């Protein structure tokens, strides 16, 4: 696995060879989702972007809207469009933030239902792709420890605590030994 992100600088390090993937996605949108306003609007935007790219093919073709279209089609059109837009429009920034925090995901490849190379993966010292979770989690844990974040492993949240107005103010959880743990917080 890896982390999907659309329109990153790392994609531009690749030669674009996924025209068939873009065409297939646009065809799937037209053939299978003509009655879905979100998919139809995204497909129209992507078709315009694709035509502009074909007229002047520089860099690697991808866009936030193409990632949204892939995600909406992958979810059979029932995804929450606002959540999909949030995910896709922030994905490149997430890759950049990880980079700023010492987590390098420069290897870009195809994966899942993406029409273009969009999955960003880590590599080891020999250039071999490694599991993103096994790579990232220890680095993020180290950053959390440096920042003084208390981590609770093998602890299962069982209840969200709320105040009289219904705002979340903490959680109750069960610890590894079966003990009840209460965590109060300003934000949950």
Predicted regions and their residues:
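Charged, glycine/proline-rich intrinsically disordered loops and linkers
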Residues: 15-69
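Conserved redox-cofactor binding core of oxidoreductases
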Residues: 46, 59-179
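Generic low-polarity alpha-helical segments
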Residues: 3, 10, 140, 144, ...
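Acidic, His- and aromatic-enriched active-site or binding-groove loops in soluble protein domains
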Residues: 8, 174, 184
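Conserved N-terminal glycine-rich FAD pyrophosphate-binding loop of Rossmann-like flavoproteins
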Residues: 1-17
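A composition-driven signal for long, intrinsically disordered, charge-rich low-complexity tracts
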Residues: 8, 20-21, 114
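Short hydrophobic core segments
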Residues: 157-158, 182-188
